[in-house]
Amino acid sequence: MDKKIENDSSIVIASDTSDSGNGKSKIRLMKDKLLLSCVEGNVSVGAFEIIYIETMGHRNIVHLKDQDFHIYEKLDTFEQLLRAHGFLRVHKSYLVNMQHIRNINSYVMTLDNGVKVSVPKARYKEVKREYADLK
């Protein structure tokens, strides 16, 4: 197994993906860290580092400040694991870390990295309420 450690945060990458594709979950939560079996290799990421997760095609993209990771796992699985860590499903394709929301206005959420996420009209009140409760 090749290991690569990036000390600029708590991201650890190990390029052994021997357990991928065996039907087991590709995500594990240990305290406040996610252990992911990604396309890029096995990755350990602090939940607080994740800005948002988006579904694109059959994979999810875990967006951090300076890095993205691709993983074949249901967004529902991420939602169940991260709900207690301040994550909110704002759209069928987006799970957002509420600590990284800059503002919500006119059905658009702006995140710390400048990304704008549309909030469906049906979910807007709930999203605004959840965000207000966090503040």
Q: For the regions a protein language model found, what residue spans apply to each?
A:
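DNA major-groove recognition helices of helix-turn-helix
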Residues: 78, 126-127
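Conserved binding/recognition cores within well-folded domains
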Residues: 7-112, 116
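C-terminal output/interaction extensions
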Residues: 127-135
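Membrane-interface aromatic/basic loop that binds lipid-linked glycans or pyrophosphate carriers
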Residues: 4
